């Protein structure tokens, strides 16, 4: 890769990082392309060389979130509880290395909830169903006591809602320490694990 190509890639990544932070803090509708350009210390014209619109930039962030959401599906597990433990340990490790992941968590949550997001982008976020896959793992593991009794869908919903809440709080309070992974696992853990 030439020096020029490296500089272009660094600029593109800077735009993505600054946009992620602003979209997470202000939402899609209240973030202006001029705000992103200013945060990235570049002109709006230069920013448009990398992303043709605010919508395309936001879509890139949501696509990154969708790709990141596939990571837990790639985990090899010895028991069903390991899937959740390793997912959270992996998420926390990535966030420590790349804080942009916190902002992407917030953006994905906003995108699922907001009616102001362009529909095709919202569909990308709504197409991620970590809860359904997790509910299937919980249902299978309940038979062996790995998970507490109860509706697997509600347990999955509660677990991932707690994770989303943690990520959103860490995004707005960067000095906050990460909670214990065990605390999150306790939401779904069954008697066999005591």
Give the label of every model feature segment.
Residues 14, 18, 22-56, 60:
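Helix-turn-helix
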Residues 1-10:
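N-terminal intrinsically disordered/low-complexity leader segments
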Residues 25-29, 98, 144:
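Short coil/turn segments at alpha/beta junctions that flank glycine-rich nucleotide-binding fingerprints
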Residues 16, 59, 85, 89, ...:
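An amphipathic alpha-helix signature
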Residues 102-106, 120-124, 128, 142-188:
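Hydrophobic/aromatic-rich alpha-helical bundle segments in the mid-to-C-terminal region
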Residues 60, 73-100, 154-159:
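Hydrophobic alpha-helical connector segments
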Residues 93-136:
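Short secondary-structure transition hinges
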Residues 63-69:
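Short, basic, alpha-helical segments at the C-terminal edge of helix-turn-helix-like DNA-binding modules
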């Amino acid at each position: 890769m030439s020096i020029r190509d490296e500089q272009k890639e660094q600029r593109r990544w800077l735009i993505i990082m600054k946009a992620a932070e602003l979209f997470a803090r202000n939402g899609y509708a209240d973030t202006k392309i001029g705000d992103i350009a200013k945060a990235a210390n570049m002109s709006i014209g230069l920013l448009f060389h990398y992303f043709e619109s605010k919508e395309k930039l936001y879509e890139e962030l949501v696509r990154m979130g969708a790709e990141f959401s596939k990571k837990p599906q790639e985990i090899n597990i010895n028991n069903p509880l390991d899937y959740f433990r390793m997912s959270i340990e992996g998420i926390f490790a990535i966030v420590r290395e790349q804080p942009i992941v916190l902002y992407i968590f917030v953006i994905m949550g906003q995108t699922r909830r907001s009616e102001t997001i362009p529909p095709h982008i919202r569909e990308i976020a709504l197409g991620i169903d970590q809860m359904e896959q997790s509910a299937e793992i919980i249902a299978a593991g309940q038979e062996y006591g790995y998970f507490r009794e109860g509706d697997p869908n509600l347990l999955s919903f509660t677990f991932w809602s707690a994770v989303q809440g943690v990520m959103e709080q860490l995004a707005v309070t960067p000095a906050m320490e990460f909670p214990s992974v065990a605390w999150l696992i306790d939401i779904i853990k069954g008697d066999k694990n005591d």
